[in-house]
UniProtKB/Swiss-Prot annotation:
Active site positions: 35, 244
Name of the protein in its database record: Alanine racemase
Cofactor: pyridoxal 5'-phosphate
Organism domain of life: Bacteria
UniProt binding sites for substrate: 130, 292
Amino acid sequence: MATATLTIDLDAIAANWRALDQMTASDCQTGAVVKADAYGLGAAKVAHALARAGARRFFVAACEEGAEVRRALGSGPQICVFSGHMEGDTALIRDFDLTPMLNSIEQLTRHFETLGGQPFGLQLDSGMNRLGLEPGEWEAVAATALEAGPELLMSHLACADEPDHPMNTEQLRAFRAMTDGTGVPRSLSATGGILLGPAWHFELTRPGIGLYGGRPFEEARPVVHLSLPVVQVREVEIGEPVGYSNSWTAEHTSTIATVAAGYADGLPRTLSSRASLFAGRVPCPLVGRVSMDLITVDVSHLPEVPDALDILCRHQTPDDLADTAGTIGYEILTSLGRRYQRRYGALAA
């Protein structure tokens, strides 16, 4: 079989949610971010696992994602949409009982005119300059918006993965200035904000990457294992090239395994001749270019070539691979290709 196997540990995701939930006070609700197909791991199955663990409020990027999660979970849990109420979203918000996080005066107007009485939340810009009402805009519409009864006031931290960054305190101060005294539940923190401490928690947190085993939640249980099948093995003599552009040449007689995965499957080309795959605990260097469907790996030092090599495992996390590729673990996870056979179960010890 030439299809790689991506194993996803739903119990580990649930355990990570519970661990993050325990970091906050009992009167602080812990939500769950399942946008981008639950960071590439399957929103329907992940949302089910998180709901069983106790999550009651889910966050997605767009209404179409919210509809998928609602189909999976049925009625009950609240599903909040970060992009708010865009033009064309009205039917989805109504039919799938979604809660848009309105982030502009235009969206406020659209929502009140088309879905008056439908639950909504508000995003406020505390300094990231990405989404949300700016302080001046909020001051102008706060009385009207609060009278309509928002479910949540939220903002987002720009530098939460850097605990000592002054922006964290600046945004906390700005958020409090906009929301103190409103009497509405508030949310400022995703995973990084949870780790900053109780001052950033308010009434609701929204962990995302920490659920899926990523930094900055260093104590997270690993969630994914990606095993790539070996398609062919050949002996390469001294001076012979491997792969596109002859970018790697054998300096000694080498055993090269051609493995079924490439940039079409989410492996960045920047891994070319830089990354390692693993045979058990033994690292094996990737040699030559990452191509669309294939990579080549030097397995000369192995006593026997296995049927598959691991690229995500206990010895190389998504963050580790991201460091090698010059990116972040979020990108590695969300780029995991559709060709992988997804298997849900416990990871091998």
